[in-house]
Amino acid sequence: MLAPLLLLLLAVPLWQAAELRLGLRGSPRGTVSPAFLSLTLDASLAREPRFITLLSNPKLHTLARGLSPGFLRFGGTSTDFLIFDPHKDSTLEEKILSELQADFSQPGFAAVQELLLAQWPGQEKLLLTEHSRKKHKNTTITGHTLDILHGFANCSGFHLVFGLNALLRRHGREWDSSNAGQLLGYCARRGYNLSWELGNEPNSFKKKSGIYIDGSQLGRDFIHLRRLLSQHPLYRHAKLYGPDVGQPRKHTQRLLRSSAAADSAEQKHYFYADHLSSPNLTSRLFLPLPHDTAQIVAATVPGKKVWLGETSSAYGGGAPQLSNTYLAGFMWLDKLGLAARQGIDVVMRQVFFGAGSYHLVDASFEPLPDYWLSLLYKRLVGTRVLEASVAGADARRLRVYLHCTNPQHPKYREGDVTLFALNLYNVSQSLQLPKQLWSKQVDQYLLLPHGKESILSRRVQLNGRLLQMVDKETLPTLHEAALAPGSALGLPAFSYGFYVIRNAKAIACI
């Protein structure tokens, strides 16, 4: 089913070396949040709450810490089917984990996790089947569920954004906040510093549950939630994010106007395709991100930021044999570049770990190509966005983006810039730096697929070295390859990589 995609990539002409045009002298094009690349956990992970305990795995903590700081959004369709019951008994697995953690005996939980991992494929199949059939059931979560979620986020260097159930209604209209009040009370008593959302994709409520809620009503519900938060000193100034929409609808403006006093950022959910690797995927691989949401927000509530609150290569769990391969990295890296260029403040990757094919970490806690790509992005790319373009090549097939280098990186200094580039040609391409940079040292971080599967590989190498964890608590060193001053930047066919230009003296980066 991927054949049309591969044919599209191959059917391109040979072009000569491209000349880079880099905006080093002016002001930055824009600035994004330090948490620009953030993560999600789908609420379906709590569909059977005992599987939440998988988040206690130390290897998963190590992998998450590598991508911090950021937001960790716990949301998705299942958000609106979660019921909090402070009196319900926790699952056996949650109780065991709690007791072992109290005794500082984390290794003792390993046997329980092995059993859960053996049962996970069946649970994953159930979740994907329910999603495809649009059959959603209420799930009860307990205080232990919240403890594990908050503990995972906190220990990994992330700020948890928790989605509250918006489908609890009085007479099908006004939001019933009683359950949310219980959940907020529990979190406040535990001292959990969280941010909040209300509902997931309200534009699809009718399809999911048969309940239609117009934008004005949902806006009033946001105001209601803000008042509820204000009853707790800990949450008086907590961030409330939303609304998050799958597609802009006519009621979006009404919702924004009604909730303007409550929300901190409007969220857009964006995927390139559905979960099937259909021929239509070829024409949708590199579509520009939609401007309509940003335009609506700017016109309705100026100053509010826009997030991509849930995004990946394909919705519905991802596209099998695509979303978890090197090939998906083209879509992910390009989306990061486009989003920053278009002023999106935060991009939340669906998902870090969970059901489907679009996760960054698989069911064996092994990092996939998009994880390593995300790790490099976090290490090398800063928040200031600069201008970049190419001359002498088709910009749709040779894509370049430029940022100030991450100032937290120990090897780099103010004035350094990070270029990341994607080559969709079937031949190698060379990028020529502007003449004023020919004397500068450039560090290359070239990502290529590893193994005979080529671009459909689930393993990746950096500058020729296979990327893999040293052990469950240690990420590998990301070794650069220093290029000789004046060298062209080489990109093999169907590849992507990062290039740090040292001492570029970019004015916006000083």
PLM feature spans:
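Non-catalytic accessory regions flanking glycosidase/transglycosidase catalytic cores in CAZymes
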Residues: L2-S264, H291, V297-G309, S313-I510
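Substrate-binding/catalytic cleft of secreted carbohydrate-active enzymes
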Residues: K207-I213, K268-P290
